[in-house]
């Protein structure tokens, strides 16, 4: 049984809240996940998830077909650490959410 985009996002939210100090919130008007310090590390927009990633995880996510850097202003100024991963790769969303959580937690 395949999930719809919103349901797939909600499954990631439920799992992250159950397994890490995570809360749901808003960022740029979109639903997002934040760590216990209130730092956003993932979000949901237009049937895709966005993740704040670094290193190999960033490169891996960006290399997926249809993925791109997140540009919330839509003015050609993408946020270099944030990658949009479309629904077609939703089977990887939880993996990237965990990587993003760790990346934000360990960022100096």
Where are these regions (language model features)?
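Charge-dense, helix-prone N-terminal extensions
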Residues: 1-108
